[in-house]
Design a protein with these regions (language model features):
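Autoprocessing Asn-cyclization modules and mimics
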Residues: 22-94
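Surface-exposed, low-hydrophobicity beta-strand/loop segments enriched in small/polar/acidic residues
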Residues: 1-24, 57-59, 63-76, 92, ...
Length: 166
C-alpha cells in the first residue's frame, strides 16, 4: 500500500496504454528527429555502457514525455543517440525519460492520486493495482483518491491537473 506521506510525485498524463511512470527524470534532452517514432539526440549516449555508471539503464518499456505533454513508450535503444518509440511518438523538441512502471498486478505499491481540477459531471477513469477498470464520477476539485492506482485512462477522463503520489 502507498504511504500516507508520499515522498515523490509525478504529473499524470492520462493514457489508455501506458502506466504512470516511476517518478524522477532519469535523463532529458532535445529530440532533433523529424520522425515521430524516432528520438535522436546527439548530446546523449543511451547505451547501457554509458548510462549504467550513472545509476540507470534505458530500455524498452521506459517512458518519454515531451515538453508538449505527449507520453509514449520506448520500443528499443537503437544506438548511442537514437531510440525507437511506440506510437504516437513525439515531435522534435525537449523531452524527459522516466523508468517505465511495468507492474506485476498486486506486487507494487502503486500511486495515490490527487485531482486538482474536477467538479460536477467529471469522470476519473483509473486502473487499480489489481487491474480493475474503475470510473469515479463527480470528483471534487483538490481531491485525494482513496484507491491505489497504476494507470489514469485517457478515454472518458475529464478531470485534469492530476498528480500521482508515491
Amino acid at each position: 500500500m502507498a504511504q500516507n506521506q508520499p515522498s515523490s510525485a509525478i504529473a499524470v498524463i492520462p493514457s489508455d496504454t501506458i502506466n504512470i511512470p516511476v517518478p524522477g527524470i532519469i535523463t532529458s534532452g532535445t529530440n532533433t528527429s523529424g520522425v515521430a517514432t524516432t528520438l535522436t539526440d546527439a548530446g546523449q549516449d543511451f547505451r547501457n555502457s554509458a548510462t549504467n555508471p550513472n545509476g540507470y539503464n534505458i530500455s524498452g518499456g521506459d517512458v518519454v514525455i515531451s515538453a508538449a505533454g505527449v507520453i509514449c513508450e520506448i520500443a528499443s535503444v537503437d544506438s548511442a543517440t537514437q531510440l525507437t518509440l511506440l506510437a504516437p511518438g513525439i515531435a522534435a523538441g525537449a523531452y524527459d525519460i522516466y523508468k517505465g512502471n511495468y507492474q506485476i498486478q498486486g506486487e507494487s505499491e502503486g500511486f495515490t492520486l490527487f485531482v486538482g481540477t474536477g467538479g460536477p459531471a467529471t469522470v476519473l477513469r483509473i486502473q487499480t493495482l489489481e487491474g480493475q477498470d474503475v470510473s469515479l464520477l463527480n470528483v471534487p476539485d483538490s481531491s485525494f483518491i482513496p484507491i491505489q492506482v497504476q494507470r489514469g485512462w485517457a478515454a472518458t477522463t475529464t478531470c485534469s491537473n492530476i498528480l500521482a503520489l508515491q
